[in-house]
Structures are given as C-alpha cells and as structure tokens.
Amino acid sequence: MLKQLSRSLGIRSSPIVANLIRSKQVCTRGFHISLVKQNTSSKVNEITDITSDSLKVKEDAAGSDLPSTKTDKKSKSESFQPVKFEDFKGKGYIHDSIINSLHKNDFKELTPIQQKSLVPIFNTEKGLVCRAKTGTGKTLAFAVPTLQYAYKNRGKGVSTVVLVPTRDLAFQIEEEYRKLISHLKYNERPNLELIIGGQRTSFNPRRPAEIVIATPGRLEKELQTDRKLAKCFSNVTYRIYDEADRLLDVGFESVLNEIDGLLYKVRTTPKPIKSLLFSATVDEAISEFSKKHIHPEYEFLNTVTKDDLEIPENIHQQLIECTDGIDKVNVSLSELHGIMKQHNDYKVIVFLPTKTAVDWFYEYITNALDDELFELFSKPPRVFMLHGGRSVRQRSAALKGFKVAKKGILISTDVAARGIDVKDVTNVMQMFPSVEIADYIHKVGRTGRAGKKGKASLFATPAELPYVSLLKRKRKVKFQEVIQSEKLNSSNIIDQIESPLDSTKEFLATMVGYLQQLQSAHRLDYDSLVIENMELYRKLVRDDKAMLESRILSRIGKGISAHVKRRYFTRTRYQSHDDAEFDSYSDFSRSGMSQRPRSNDRSSKMTFNGRGKYGNNRNNDWSYQNKNRYNNNNNRQTERSYDSDRKSHNDWKYEKKFEHRRIRDHDE
C-alpha cells in the first residue's frame, strides 16, 4: 500500500521537478524554493505556468468558464470606477472598518488621482508607475491599499516599505497613516514605524511593525547591521517609492539598488514585491529605474493630462522685478508687512536657498518684530524656521507649530518644497532662483491646496531674469501679474532693521557658492550675481567698503572676474571674529553644500600657519600660528606671549597653557 502511494506521488510530481530543474529563475535547496531575480521577467515562476496550463486544458475539455486571472481583473477594474469611498463597500477591496475610518477623517470623495489609481494598485501584478502632481491626494492613494493589506496580515512582519527622500516627507506620510489607524479598533490596528536619519530607531524585531516609512540611507544601514531587523523584512509585499524624481535627483539610486538586493537576500517567498512608484515627472531616468526596480513591462498610469496645468489656476502667480539685491530684500519685507497688516489670518512660507540664509532671515525678521518696526494692527505672527541643519525634534516642532498657528511665517530651504501638506497656506515667497527648475513648481504648490486660493510671489533682479525666461519656456509658467518694484510704495525697511553681523557674513559667504550653482545650471552672469549680493552685504552691515575673506573662493568662487575679486574680497583677516567664526564662513555643511574634505587622521585639525595659509597639522587644534597672536577679546596678548623671535621655556609653557584655556573656553 505504502509502496503504491509513494510510486504514484513520484509519478505526479516528476513533471514539476523536471520543470524546476530546467528553470534558470529558481533554485532549490531541500524543499525550499526562492527566486534569484524577482522582477526581471514577466514569468515570475514556472510553477504558476503549470497551474495555468492545467486550467486551460480543463477549460478546453469541459467548456467551463474558469476565469483567466489577468483579463478578469482588467475587466473588473474597467467596470468598477469608484467616485466615493462608500462605493468600495461590498466589493472586497477595502474593509468596512477602514472605510468608516476614512469617513471619520472627512475623506469621502475621491480625488481624480484616487479614482484612477486605487483599483489598479489593488489589482497590479507587475507593479505600477504613477505620474501625479503634488497636492492631489496621492499619499492616500497608496496608504489605503497598503493599510488594507496590513490590516489583514497583522503580526506577520513588515508588509509595506515606503521610501522617501526627506525626513519631513516621512513625518507627513506617517501623519496620514496615523489618521486612518487611530479610528480602527485598538486590537485591529497595524503597527507603524519610522526608520529615518537623525533619530533613534525604535523598531522592535519581536513585535515588528507592518508598515515602515524610511529614508534610504538609514534603512540601508539598519538592514546591513541588524540581522534580526532584516529578517522582519522577509515577506514585504508592497514597496513604495514616493517623490521618485527627487530620490534620484539627490543621488539615492545606488542606495536604492543596495536596499533592493538586501530585501531579496532575506526574502523567503517566491512572490515578487509589488513596487509602486509615484513621481511628478516621468523622464528617461525614472523609466530606466522603473524597469530595473518595478518590472521590465511595468504598468504606467498617467493622472496628468495635457490640459492640466502644472500650477492650478487657483494660485495667483506674481513676478516682482527688482532693481538689485538691496531692492529685493526691501520689497520682500514690504510684501510681508502688507500681508501682516491687511489680513487677520495668514500663513506665509518664505523660501531661501541655504541654511545660513534661513538663519539670517529668521533672526532679521524676529529682531524687527521684537523692536515693533512693523506697523501692525493686531497680534504679530509666530515665526518658524526649517532646514536640514535643524534636529528632527526642532523640525517637527516647527512644522507642528506652523500648522496650528493662525498667523505664521515659515522660513525654509527646499526641504519644505515637497511633501509638506500644510492647510491654509495663503502666500509663498521665493526670494532667489532654484537650481532645479521643477522646484519652482513644487514650492508654488505649497499654497492653493485642496482647491483653495493662494498667492505665489517670485522676486527677481536683472541678473536673475534669464531664470524667469527658462520657467516660461520649459515649464510653461504664466505669471498673472508682473510688477516693477519702482511702482510699489515700499518703505525703506532695510535701513530700520539692524542685521546681525555674524549671521550676515555667513549668509553671504555661503551664497557665493550657491550663486555658482545657479550660474552653471542656468547660465546666469556670475559676476553680476556676486556684485548684487555683495552690495546687499555692504548695505546690511552698514559699511560701504566691507569685504569678505578671499579664502572662501578657493573652492566655491571659481569663475569670478579678477576685478570683482579685488573689489569685494580681501586676503586680510578680519579681527572682529575668532578663528571658529572665521572658519564657519566657509562651512558648506551649513549652506546645504558638500563639506570640506578633512584628513583621514581623526586627530587632525586645521591650522593657520605662519605664511597666512591653512595647513593640515595632524596634532594641533585649530590655532592661529602667525607672529601676531590675539586673545578672545581681540586684543594683543602680553609681551610674554607676543615675543615673535626667541622665547624662553617658561614663555612657551605659558603660551601653551593660554592656548588650551582659549580652546576650552571656545568649546564651552
């Protein structure tokens, strides 16, 4: 009896075994089957081909109406076109508990992108690439299907990974998920976890979250270093690339390739990961990336029609042509003053290009408000700042404060240009051109959300007008209003506000590098840009002959004409700042650019040698080693330490002691 049973089992299984041996896409180890390359072929597994062949034989023989999965899903999705979330009830797509949660969050009507993408996301087998404009509800388009899967598969490890370019976007997506999860029964709630840079990961491998939102760099590190955590990703079903164009722009492609390999390395199921990619633009780079990470024959869904404008009509775009950099700051301050004076409730986002620019403008505005230089008829606004140099806690607090404020001004770098969904933003002000032309569109998209009216202002000097021409030619941007600054009754506010010397210097020093990026990106006149901004610097510090140290030009000032260098840059070291402050003028990390390379020796510190240059002394701390030595009060030291020729043993000992004290005081 047993012999006959084993013989029959061997006969029945032999075709499957033979097919497995012939297959190049599967490898066998014991009774475990796993795919080596999940997304490189439309035939995911030849076992499924055997099953479909057997079904086809049965259909031909018996004339039955067994469904062909692919066509049935397609016809089903074509016949079912939901308009409201209620339409999903009884259709088997979304659980009633999640639909009720959507209603409690006031999500009732589907946005156009949700109408077009929700059902295809549920039905897709090859993965989906979706072109969608910002602010159209795409987050909910992937949040609902992934939450539905996590709801049905609680306690089975990570089922969804959402990859985003910035921490701020991660917080925004987390908030959307939390809204939906909070209205589910406590024992039915899927777990949610953030794995992002700048904060400690609280992921618990014993009770892994079903949904993980991550920035690429941090997720790669965790998957490489924590085996227990990596095992929790063995059954990932959905992988979301949100703001994919931004992910590639900032150079995350190699990291995403590594993450892809790490996920498939720990994978225990033969099924491929369903990858969904969302992007405002789909160019050749996105297409090649999608073929590699989604599927060679990925499904493409375009929710942006030819008639759709990149910037909605409810946003009033205004171009203010300024005479120079000084006029630009003056007019922008007058514009802010007008908003504060004329409106009871308002939210304004002011975009600046570098971290030091944000620091300076924040201090500049708060000083003006504290001194009551703006004539206001009501309570002054709350002012917040946001940039990559702030901690996660500070950035989160700034965003939350700005969201709840009735009157608020957010001063930010490009980190707030994408993925930040703040309701009721009335005005967006861009004071400088963006390196990426698409960033203009994203910044403008922070206002006029959910169909409400908004106003976007761009301030441009004569040297920056070619950038405006590029916007019109490449992105079909149409300004409803073009104003010359001379026609505005702007008061001379810039003379009434005292600009902090240190932050002003840092702002203008790092701007030199940013202006070079603009020149190379848009072919602007570098000399004219530098002259405009250096004249602004002199106006702010109230010194008609103020100059910046030419040392900052060693890496970021190439291309400036000799006469401009002589006019605005000097080799003389200003004595009004100590060494650490002087160094910070060229600290690119504060401006959002790459950091200055350091020596491989961790103990090495930069030193200023006797020739007036900076060397790499591996043992000394940052110190000024010229003949003239200055203490913290910027006065010359006593003759004991100022002797430029011979010094006794006691003199050197005294100087060493003084140097340590100076460094210690600076660190404190």
Curated annotation (Swiss-Prot):
A motif (DEAD box) lies at residues 242-245. The lineage of its organism: Eukaryota, Fungi, Dikarya, Ascomycota, Saccharomycotina. Its EC number is 3.6.4.13. Residues 637-668 have a biased composition (Basic and acidic residues). It comes from Candida albicans (strain SC5314 / ATCC MYA-2876) (Yeast). It is an enzyme of class 3 (hydrolase). ATP-dependent RNA helicase required for mitochondrial splicing of group I and II introns. Also required for efficient mitochondrial translation. The keyword Nucleus does not apply. ATP binds at A132, K133, T134, G135, T136, G137, K138, T139. Residues 586-597 have a biased composition (Polar residues). The Q motif is unique to and characteristic of the DEAD box family of RNA helicases and controls ATP binding and hydrolysis. It is found in: Mitochondrion matrix. The keyword Chaperone does not apply. Residues 609-636 have a biased composition (Low complexity). Keywords: ATP-binding, Helicase, Hydrolase, Mitochondrion, mRNA processing, mRNA splicing, Nucleotide-binding, RNA-binding, Transit peptide, Translation regulation. A motif (Q motif) lies at residues 87-115. One of its GO terms (cellular component) is mitochondrial matrix. Residues 1-38 form a transit peptide. One of its GO terms (molecular function) is RNA binding. This is ATP-dependent RNA helicase MSS116, mitochondrial. Residues 119-300 form the Helicase ATP-binding domain. It catalyses: ATP + H2O = ADP + phosphate + H(+). Transmembrane segments: none annotated. GO terms for biological process: mRNA processing; regulation of translation; RNA splicing. The gene is MSS116.
